[in-house]
């Protein structure tokens, strides 16, 4: 095709994504659009078609973004090329959303006609507005008995400030309103800007590792054209590769002759080393490079850190390779090697949140067959020492000696909790119990309230979300942003087994709750750790001071069984001998700590604050 034809083709391209809160029907709507445009035959169709990971189907959530090309013949008789980029809706995967929005010009905002706007909807809409996208509101699930489309239409206008007068009323499940949505995409979403004759600039928004073809890049072509045989160059590190194949996804990968401006597709170039590519990087041609890289993504900083250790120590290298492959298409995952006296060699990993951590752990165990032990998650503290240094600490075992600490700052988040009016009391009580400071409260409509608190991230990391759902019967929705660091009265608590510190069980706790938490954890460990041949004391200590103790009684063999009657001094001699043996055993004996013990540090949180 000459550049004139390519420019005409470019005018027919529409790139859009679907944004919504969890469970508002995003993946179902994507399924209907695929059916309506006959991208997928009814024989191949299955629910949640774009959620290709087993984990996504089981949990009913979207974790990874997906990009698909569809052809749609509009009412004006022209055929348009749609690129649908599916996005996750959960707070931990905001990074995935921001990446997919950077590859689009428009976004369909799906709002549940019964539930209205939720916290996550707002967060993702603001991301879309930051990227200057054209937003098309769609009110979904209008066939539900509790649906109230007019109320939701007003909510969209009042809370978000979008004109919802032309919002499509739809039911993705029943297939109502799908055609109107497609027509609105044609009319309202702008065609991609960009120049086909300019040097190639392609934004990498995702990548996957293929054992045969190496790293496969998913790209959005912003300027220029790329075809197989071209020599491409990464703009961040200058490395060059020969393109072996370009193509698009129609969920399946289909090879093409070229990808031109406005296209969304994949590029394979025999990239063998995982570290050579980075999501957010710009690809250009080696013989005619672009002058500057595209504006990438803001790098997300991990909020939660935990240690990951293979149960079998010879799997350490396998774990490293697995983490590198996961990092390819999950750029927000960070890791570095660490060692623990209790657990051996492993990695300290940074995650965006607890669900992210959970998903990574499950993917490592399923996709790479590695059995893992995970330590309790922790956040990044700023420790100011007496010699006026500031150290960032994400691992409790790296905390400096208490005598060197001047003060400690911990991260606070601004939490937005949307909840029906009747549960406001429960939400406030929970937030206060988690050391939260009340900021403000806005009424969205007669019944729904947006409550804003400043809460320490460390309190949210454990089980805030579960507690919030149970105290509001599942009605609350929740979103948080990093706010600031504040001084707090924090101490490091060590757990001693048989007089030895177990580094992997150390955790940071607020002074106020230290005594109760210490007491609860030693009692929990007493139940979990199996009895030994000798007595094992479990102690919780802050610095040198022991704040709680519990003993696991020794298992004991009845050495008097063979003495029927007989002399008492004979019995005493046998008992003394047993006692001496136990003493010797205790001096050299080591205690096996089961995996549950590490997790019990997490779940004790609730008991401490009842």
Curated annotation (Swiss-Prot):
GO MF annotation list: GTP binding; GTPase activity; ribosome binding; translation elongation factor activity
Enzyme class: hydrolase
Catalytic activity entry: GTP + H2O = GDP + phosphate + H(+)
Localization terms from the record: Cell membrane
GO CC annotation: plasma membrane
Homology family: Belongs to the TRAFAC class translation factor GTPase superfamily. Classic translation factor GTPase family. LepA subfamily.
Record's function text: Required for accurate and efficient protein synthesis under certain stress conditions. May act as a fidelity factor of the translation reaction, by catalyzing a one-codon backward translocation of tRNAs on improperly translocated ribosomes. Back-translocation proceeds from a post-translocation (POST) complex to a pre-translocation (PRE) complex, thus giving elongation factor G a second chance to translocate the tRNAs correctly. Binds to ribosomes in a GTP-dependent manner.
GO BP: positive regulation of translation
Binding of GTP, residues: 23-28, 140-143
Main location: membrane
CDD domains, per database record: EF4_II, EF4_III, LepA, lepA_C
Membrane topology: Peripheral membrane protein
Keywords carried by this UniProt record: Cell membrane, GTP-binding, Hydrolase, Membrane, Nucleotide-binding, Protein biosynthesis
Source organism (scientific name): Streptococcus pyogenes serotype M2 (strain MGAS10270)
SUPFAM superfamilies given in the database record: EF-G C-terminal domain-like, P-loop containing nucleoside triphosphate hydrolases, Translation proteins
Ranges of residues in domain tr-type G: 11-193
Protein name: Elongation factor 4
SMART domains associated with the record: EFG_C
InterPro entries: EF-4, EFG_II, EFG_III/V, EFG_V-like, EFTu-like_2, G_TR_CS, LepA_C_sf, LepA_CTD
Pfam families referenced in this protein's UniProt entry, alphabetically: EFG_C (PF00679), EFG_III (PF14492), GTP_EFTU (PF00009), GTP_EFTU_D2 (PF03144), LepA_C (PF06421)
E.C. numbers: 3.6.5.n1
């Amino acid at each position: 095709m000459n550049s004139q034809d390519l420019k005409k083709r470019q005018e027919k391209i529409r790139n859009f994504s679907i944004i919504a809160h969890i469970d508002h029907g995003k993946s179902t709507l994507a399924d209907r659009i695929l059916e309506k445009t006959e991208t997928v035959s009814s024989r191949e169709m299955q629910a949640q078609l774009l959620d290709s990971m087993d984990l996504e189907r089981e949990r009913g959530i979207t974790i990874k973004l997906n990009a698909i090309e569809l052809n749609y013949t509009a009412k004006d008789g022209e055929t348009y090329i749609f690129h649908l980029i599916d996005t996750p809706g959960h707070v931990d995967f905001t990074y995935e959303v921001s990446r997919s929005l950077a590859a689009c010009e428009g976004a369909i905002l799906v709002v549940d006609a019964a539930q209205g706007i939720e916290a996550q909807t707002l967060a993702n809409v603001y991301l879309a507005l930051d990227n200057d996208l054209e937003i098309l509101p769609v009110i979904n699930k209008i066939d539900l008995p509790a649906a109230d489309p007019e109320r939701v239409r007003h909510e969209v206008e009042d809370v978000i400030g979008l004109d919802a007068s032309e919002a499509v009323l739809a039911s993705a499940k029943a297939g109502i309103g799908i055609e109107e949505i497609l027509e609105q995409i044609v009319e309202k979403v702008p065609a991609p800007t960009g120049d086909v004759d300019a040097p190639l600039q392609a934004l990498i928004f995702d990548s996957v590792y293929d054992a045969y073809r190496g790293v496969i890049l998913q790209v959005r072509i912003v300027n220029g054209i790329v075809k197989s045989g071209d020599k491409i160059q990464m703009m961040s590190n200058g490395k060059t590769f020969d393109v072996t194949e370009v193509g698009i996804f129609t969920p399946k990968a289909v090879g093409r002759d070229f990808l031109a401006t406005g296209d969304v597709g994949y590029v394979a170039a025999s990239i063998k080393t995982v570290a050579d590519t980075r999501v957010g990087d710009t690809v250009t041609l080696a013989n005619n490079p672009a002058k500057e890289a595209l504006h990438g993504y803001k790098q997300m900083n991990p909020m939660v850190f935990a240690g990951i250790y293979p149960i079998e120590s010879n799997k350490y290298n396998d774990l490293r390779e697995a983490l590198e492959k996961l990092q390819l298409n999950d750029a927000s995952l960070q890791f570095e090697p660490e060692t623990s006296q209790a657990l051996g060699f492993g990695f300290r990993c940074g995650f965006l949140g607890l669900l992210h951590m959970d998903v990574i752990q499950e993917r490592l165990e399923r996709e790479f067959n590695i059995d893992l032990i995970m330590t309790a998650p922790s956040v990044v503290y700023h420790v100011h020492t007496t010699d006026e240094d500031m150290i960032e600490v994400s691992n409790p075992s790296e905390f400096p000696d208490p005598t060197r600490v001047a003060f400690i700052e911990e991260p606070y988040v601004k939490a937005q909790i949307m909840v029906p009016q009747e549960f406001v009391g429960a939400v406030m009580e929970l937030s206060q119990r988690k050391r939260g400071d009340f900021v403000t409260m806005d009424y969205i409509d007669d019944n729904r309230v947006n409550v804003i608190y400043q809460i320490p991230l460390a309190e949210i990391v454990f089980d805030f979300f579960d507690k919030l759902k149970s105290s509001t019967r599942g009605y609350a929705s929740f979103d948080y942003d990093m706010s600031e660091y504040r001084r707090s009265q924090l101490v490091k608590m060590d757990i001693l087994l048989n007089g030895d510190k177990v580094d992997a069980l150390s955790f940071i706790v607020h002074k106020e709750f230290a005594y109760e938490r210490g007491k609860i954890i030693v009692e929990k460990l007493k139940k979990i750790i199996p009895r030994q041949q000798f007595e094992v004391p479990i102690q919780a200590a802050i610095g040198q001071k022991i704040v709680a103790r519990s003993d696991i009684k020794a298992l004991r063999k009845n050495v008097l069984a063979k003495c029927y009657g007989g002399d008492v001094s004979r019995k005493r001699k046998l008992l003394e001998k047993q006692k001496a043996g136990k003493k010797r055993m205790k001096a050299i004996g080591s205690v096996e700590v089961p995996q549950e013990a590490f997790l019990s540090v997490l779940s004790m949180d609730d008991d401490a604050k009842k």
